[in-house]
């Protein structure tokens, strides 16, 4: 049992490295295919759209609850790797890349939420700690392609695609080979096409979901446009920050806050931790223009590292609240559905920033993200009218 959590965490890290693989090589793709600046938003949204479509299919068919989640994770890793690898094919068009990234996102739906389902099948007590490490692995996996791009900078961008595809395959193999069905797994008895609506009938899940939706408005848009902001900072201050490396560092540091939040969930309520994180990240949104406009790269990087810590710390807490309050027979489906709606929201915020990036001074771009933490805190406040969240 002691080896199970590290195996799940490592597998999650390896397989979710596919998520931002396209973003990490976007500068190279832009030069090779003469892509417009707004392609960044479209590339990120393609993965998110795929993930949403995947989560809807997985949820409606209750795949994670009806079939062995380890095998679901494995086959999803294999198929996501294939779609990811295909991006490196010769004479590929910008549209074809978007379609392939959609396919990668679709099968990521069988990796991220299913990984949480596997963890919840093993750890009834200390679930917050387990999910803290697990989502920390997701964050690190998301950041990892930026590090690979930085380390392999002199080499062709296709090496980044190769590396992430191979890592995802290894992650899937580790799960199916060494992580059997958990002791708390309760198999679903059949397909339930009304499950989407049933999830939000539970007040405790609904409150946690509202907080999560506010969190998601901010998170992926911040991650997606972080390299853009760093490049803009370089241009207005005539600096030469390593955009890929610092994008990795700022995103990856969130894995630490996820893990720490998970450990603290044994002493403090998940709601309290999530509320604190939302408050800090909301403040970061509001003061971001001041920090981007000033010319000290040290000050900016410290600020963005703090933001990187705060923007992710609440994520495992929301997943913990959903998992703890969902019926055992539909826990995986509940997590998948809440994820699906959350990622739908990320598309709106990403495309909004994509639109604004060509119409307003980029210094003010992240102000829009402040709406998420505010609404998230309001959503969590609904708990005061019911005591279901623990």
Model-identified regions with their sequence ranges:
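A late C-terminal transmembrane helix in Major Facilitator Superfamily
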Residues: 325-360
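Cytoplasmic helix-loop-helix junction between adjacent transmembrane helices
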Residues: 100-136
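Conserved MFS/SLC helix-loop-helix module at the cytosolic interface between two early adjacent transmembrane helices
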Residues: 55-93
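Extracytoplasmic gate region of multi-pass secondary transporters
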Residues: 22-23, 204-255
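Juxtamembrane intracellular "pre-TM" segments in multi-pass secondary transporters
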Residues: 181-210
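Helix-to-loop junctions at the C-terminal end of transmembrane segments
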Residues: 55-68, 258-270, 357
């Amino acid at each position: 049992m002691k080896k199970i959590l590290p195996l799940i965490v490592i597998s999650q890290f390896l397989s979710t490295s596919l998520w931002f693989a396209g973003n990490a090589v976007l500068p190279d793709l832009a030069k090779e295919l003469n892509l417009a600046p707004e392609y960044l938003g479209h590339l990120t949204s393609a993965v998110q759209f795929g993930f949403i479509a995947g989560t809807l299919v997985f949820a409606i068919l209750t795949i994670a609850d009806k079939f062995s989640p380890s095998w679901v994770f494995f086959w999803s890793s294999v198929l996501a790797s294939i779609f990811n690898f295909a991006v490196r094919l010769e004479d590929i068009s910008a549209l074809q890349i978007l379609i392939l990234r959609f396919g990668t996102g679709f099968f990521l739906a069988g990796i991220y939420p299913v990984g949480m389902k596997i963890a919840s099948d093993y750890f009834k007590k200390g679930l917050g700690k387990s999910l803290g490490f697990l989502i920390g692995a997701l964050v690190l996996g998301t950041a990892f392609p930026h590090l690979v791009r930085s380390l392999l900078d002199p080499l062709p961008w296709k090496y980044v695609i190769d590396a992430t595809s191979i890592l995802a395959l290894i992650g899937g193999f580790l799960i199916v080979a060494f992580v059997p069905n958990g002791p708390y797994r309760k198999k679903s008895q059949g397909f339930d096409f009304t499950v989407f609506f049933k999830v939000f009938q539970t007040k405790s899940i609904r409150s946690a979901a509202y907080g999560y939706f506010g969190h998601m408005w901010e998170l992926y848009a911040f991650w997606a446009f972080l390299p853009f902001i760093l490049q803009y900072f370089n241009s207005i201050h005539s600096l030469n920050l390593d955009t890929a490396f610092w994008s990795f560092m700022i995103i990856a540091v969130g894995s630490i806050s996820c893990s720490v939040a998970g450990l603290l969930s044994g002493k403090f309520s998940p709601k309290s931790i999530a509320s604190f994180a939302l408050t800090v990240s909301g403040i970061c949104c509001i003061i971001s223009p001041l920090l981007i406009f000033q010319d000290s790269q040290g000050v900016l990087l410290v600020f963005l590292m703090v933001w990187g810590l705060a923007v992710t710390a609440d994520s495992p807490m929301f997943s913990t609240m959903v998992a703890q309050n969902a019926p055992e027979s539909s826990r995986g489906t509940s997590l998948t559905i809440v994820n699906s709606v959350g990622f739908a929201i990320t598309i709106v915020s990403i495309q909004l920033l994509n639109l604004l990036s060509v119409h307003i001074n980029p210094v003010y771009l992240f102000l829009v993200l402040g709406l998420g933490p505010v609404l998230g805190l309001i959503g969590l406040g609904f708990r005061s009218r019911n005591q279901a969240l623990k």
